[in-house]
Amino acid sequence: MPEHFKSYDIRTSWFQKVPFSNRLYKAMLPLMPRAFEAFDLTEYDLVLSSSSSCSKGVITRPDAVHICYCHTPIRYVWDFYYTYRDNANWLAKLVMPGQMHKMRIWDKCAADRVDYFIANSHYIAQRIKKYYRRDSDVIYPCCHINESPFVEKEDFYLTVGRLTWYKRVDLAVQACTRLNKRLVVIGGGGELDKLRAMAGPTIEFKGGGLSDEEVRSYYLRAKGFLFPGEEDFGITPVEAQTRGHAGAGLWPRRACESVLPGRTGYWFKEQTVESLADCIERFERDGVACSKEEIREHSRSFSEERFERELKEYCLRRMADWQQELLDCSHWEKEELD
């Protein structure tokens, strides 16, 4: 647990006490809705949930306001269900159809309990509308703006994140191997051995045990950042831009709202090695229009201060809206009784 969390009043659910829940949480998915519904939130006038799965399913008082900051509708339940199923083991493939059918029903019911949705991107707002039939307001997530002095860029690309199949780090590894470009991969995960096997001599794996200072050093020195995966927003390209370098290789159908094509980075149109390699070559040939200072300045639109201000203003406005609705309802009920 981060040190600054220790001063908070953190109250966990009974799920925290289930043996091996921290390691086998995926297998215990059917228990998660019950765990969140067990929270007693009757003393709260405002409930703010941060959800990519089940936390939006908490139960609140009828006169309380529940605002959900939604990172995504549950990916493995909705549009990514078939992809997750295809990458699962045989036992998971056997039980997934029945379990996911039940989860879809519960997830829609849970979404109906939310009074107001905030989406972390316009892409997620579209998915909320698609699967929950709900409107949402967009507030982009935040990133710490690095104010370290710029250093001379070195001749390597960087990618950072968990090494799981949906991050598609394999595209970056194969593209840089094909182009004979140096790539530094920071992160650990189940795909590490597979990625090592396909990597050429220009690919370096640093694992997931680096300190924050070491990761920052690579961010500052890299000449470009590769982000080939499908994400709901994708905060790592913003982190790269705070260091003043371009995000070369972002797929435009997903998670690219933080990148200005041709100015602070490039998009590649298809999630293939060929498309990413072409994007890297364009970056090598043409560069980007913005300077390091301008790229960092663009990243300030995702600052912590901006996020805190927008979120507070939104919550206060929705609280006022909700109170007005309650007042209007009470007047209507009084008129009906009269």
What do these predicted regions represent?
Residues Q271, A289-E336:
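A charged, aromatic-enriched C-terminal amphipathic alpha-helix characteristic of glycosyltransferases
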Residues M1-K56:
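Active-site donor-binding segments of glycosyltransferases and PAPS-dependent sulfotransferases
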Residues D86-F117, A125:
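Membrane-proximal helix-turn-helix segments that form the acceptor-binding/catalytic region
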Residues L220-D232, H245:
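Acidic donor-binding loop of glycosyltransferase active sites
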Residues C143, P149-V184:
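Conserved donor-binding/catalytic core segment of Leloir-type glycosyltransferases
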Residues L226, A246-W251, V259:
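Short hydrophobic beta-strand element within catalytic cores of glycosyltransferases
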Residues D193-E213:
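Nucleotide-activated donor-binding/catalytic signature segment of Leloir-type glycosyltransferases, i.e.
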